[in-house]
Amino acid sequence: MKTISFLVIVISAGILAGIVHGMLNIILVEPYLDNAIGIENQRLFAEGQAKDTPQFWQQFTDYRIWQKQGSIVAGAMLGASTGALFGLVFAYSRKSLPSDNDIKKALILASIMWAVLYFIPFLKYPANPPTVGEPDTIAFRASTYALFVALSGFGAVGFAFLYKKMKNRKFLVFVGYAGFMGIMFVIMPPNPDPIGTSMDLVNGFRIISAVTMTTYWIVNGVILGWMWKKVKPDAVPVA
């Protein structure tokens, strides 16, 4: 394995996919965030926690501009971290993945990691706009979500090793993983915060968030597969 070439392509693929994710968030997700934050601001005014003044709106506008500008950077950071993990798993499992085409191989793995690290946790703890959730529960919600992602990820790794060792009835591995995650769904606590805002806003935010994250994994898979095909970091040098 050519270490430098490997690191360059996996990090580059992740960052590029992350930038696409950040741009999509600005275009598609930010309007929902604006609506949700607008509702939250009105609640603050009604409860006397903030005053509807020009100074408030100036500070709010400056903060939102800073947030939106940071979406690209946040996307790139997400891409660099998850892209590195994706690249490591791809390098390890590439020969075991079906197809002779590196792009198809990468897309297959991307779909698996999307399901394990995003979609299955999303079913238990779907994304909510800022107007949903109390400040006091942020740490609890973040920790339970991270734990569920870890359980899903490590569970998938464990059952993947079983899949390689089993010669017959490999479908039982998928049944086992599904059963394991079903138990985790029951054991793990639910989201503690009730939804007190429009479900149209919440569902729209969840759908668009899922679209942007799904796009991220697809783009990461395509770019990594294409770069791997071109660079061939695992090629053995000819003496």
Q: Could you describe each region identified by the protein language model?
A:
Residues 1-239:
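Juxtamembrane/disordered regions of integral membrane proteins
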